[in-house]
């Protein structure tokens, strides 16, 4: 797994945030997209950008801005791909297993270092589905103390194997529509006011994350990471508030 870190040697003791890019991009592109947010928080956290393992077509808006930054990558398929694209259940499970192993290795590697390890996750678009699945994971979810969900999409992508993503969704919907307990960690949900996937972002928040522990940051934009200094500072302020809440 290709890994990029924003930290220098002196920052090695800072707690880390695992950064998961959207489909059709990569770690380098997400690092560039999130650079203003990272700049606002680099004194508090290390940001670890990781590449998804599977090649894909470029995502929306990637061309022409990032035409030279290849390959374009994606996370694992969900069960919908079995019917829509004639993908075998075995392939879906194998992809899920590989993503879980990659993320597991990185969490364990950071846990043996001098810092607090990976304490949070920041994700964009398809990466938010993986991030939510990570927080749900019974083995690794407890290490994630807060989440930054940028332009979220739905549903969560489970990291357990074999578990269908519809079953992941059903964790939050009982018989007769009764709701089970949602993720009880602080979260920041960053949403562009013109994002065509806005309803999916709202559904991810409603069904998977505790509203009492969630902060929503709106910005003028579409399906993108906010880049203006004003918007980045608003996100950073919310993140620091979440971090404070997670430690109390």
Swiss-Prot record:
One of its GO terms (cellular component) is nucleus. GO terms for molecular function: hydrolase activity. Disruption phenotype: Abolishes the production of fusarielins F, G and H. Pathway: Secondary metabolite biosynthesis. Keywords: Hydrolase. It is an enzyme of class 3 (hydrolase). The keyword Cytoplasm does not apply. The active site is at residues 125, 195, 223. Thioesterase; part of the gene cluster that mediates the biosynthesis of fusarielins F, G and H, decaketide compounds with 5 methylations and a decaline core that act as mycoestrogens as they stimulate growth of MCF-7 breast cancer cells. The initial compound in the pathway is produced by the reducing polyketide synthase FSL1. FSL1 lacks an active enoyl reductase (ER) domain and biosynthesis of fusarielins relies on the trans-acting enoyl reductase FSL5, before it is released through hydrolysis catalyzed by the thioesterase FSL2. This is Thioesterase FSL2. The gene is FSL2.
């Amino acid at each position: 797994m290709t890994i990029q870190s924003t930290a220098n040697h002196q920052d090695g003791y800072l707690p880390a945030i695992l950064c998961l890019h959207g489909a059709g991009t990569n770690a380098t592109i997400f690092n560039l997209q999130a650079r203003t947010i990272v700049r606002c928080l680099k004194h508090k956290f290390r940001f670890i950008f990781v590449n998804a393992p599977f090649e894909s077509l470029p995502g929306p808006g990637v061309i022409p801005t990032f035409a030279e930054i290849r390959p374009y990558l994606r996370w694992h398929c969900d069960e919908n791909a079995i019917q829509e694209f004639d993908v075998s259940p075995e392939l879906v499970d194998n992809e899920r297993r590989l993503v879980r192993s990659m993320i597991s290795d990185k969490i364990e590697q950071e846990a043996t270092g001098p810092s607090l390890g990976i304490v949070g996750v920041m994700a964009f678009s398809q990466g938010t589905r993986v991030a939510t699945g990570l927080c749900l994971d019974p083995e690794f979810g407890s290490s994630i103390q807060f989440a930054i969900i940028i332009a979220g999409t739905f549903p969560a992508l489970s990291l357990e194997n074999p578990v269908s993503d519809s079953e992941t969704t059903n964790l939050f919907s009982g018989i007769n529509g009764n709701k089970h307990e949602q993720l009880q960690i602080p979260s920041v949900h960053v949403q562009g006011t013109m994002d065509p996937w806005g309803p999916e972002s709202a559904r991810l928040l409603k069904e998977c994350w505790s509203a009492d522990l969630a902060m929503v940051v709106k910005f003028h934009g579409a399906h993108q990471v906010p880049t203006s200094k004003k918007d980045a500072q608003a996100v950073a302020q919310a993140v620091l508030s979440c971090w404070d809440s997670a430690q109390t």
